[in-house]
Each structure stands twice: as C-alpha cells, then as structure tokens.
Amino acid sequence: MSALVYFSSSSENTHRFMQRLGLPATRIPLNERERIQVDEPYILVVPSYGGGGMAGAVPRQVIRFLNDEHNRARIRGVIASGNRNFGDAWGCAGDVIAQKCGVPWLYRFELMGTQRDIDNVRKGVNEFWQQLSRSA
C-alpha cells in the first residue's frame, strides 16, 4: 500500500482520526515554515476551513504543500473532513483539491469520524491502491 499524507490543525481532529485509522501516514507540519516532500504516490487527508464557503476552505499549509510540484505530482486522491453545520459546503476542501489536482475525491467524514468512517476509509484506501496497481 502507498502513503497517506494529512494535515491537522491544533484541534487535532484529523490527527485523532489518523491515529485511529492505524495506517502509515505523514503529517504536514502545522508550522508553515516547515516543509516536507513526499517521494511516493499518496492520498491526502485534509480538514475543511472557512465556515462553509469555498474561499479559505483549504488550509494554507496544504496549499503550500501542494504548490511544491514534487508533492503535487504524487497526489492520487483526497479524503476530506469537515463539519456538517456548514451544510452543502462541509468537507469542501476535498472538492477543491480534487478539482485543482485532477484526482478523485474518495471520502468525506465529520470532525474526528466514527468507527464506521474508520472502517470505510481503511477498506476504501486498500481497494483504491489495488485498483491503481491493476490499471498501471
């Protein structure tokens, strides 16, 4: 299986989700001056910001990470978290990234996710990588 890369704000909701998921993952640093590069294909797990609108939905750290061509070339899919209070815009960072990077939006979960979300993502990630390897 290939990599998961995620960002979590100081609320740690996405981080707790990733810990419960139990799959190898790399965290995009909260400090915007710290940079990472990913050398293998990955699925990005990202929270949505901005109170429900598209403007500001993608965290700045994630924008900076994806503006690095090395990292952008390796993204294969996106999973988004959000808050259902934002209505139709909940998890919209995933929609924005999927469109801009030309990758599939794979899943959306609320806040820290439920056990069902954990199970669905674990299964979906495995199936996604298997499907990609068969089509390569």
Swiss-Prot record:
GO BP field: protein modification process
Domain of life: Bacteria
Gene3D superfamilies the UniProt entry points to: 3.40.50.360
One MF annotation (Gene Ontology) recorded for this entry: FMN binding
SUPFAM superfamilies per UniProt: Flavoproteins
UniProt xrefs under InterPro entries: Flavoprotein-like_sf (IPR029039), RNR_Ib_NrdI_bac (IPR020852), RNR_NrdI (IPR004465)
Role description: Probably involved in ribonucleotide reductase function.
Family (UniProt): Belongs to the NrdI family.
UniProt name for this protein: Protein NrdI
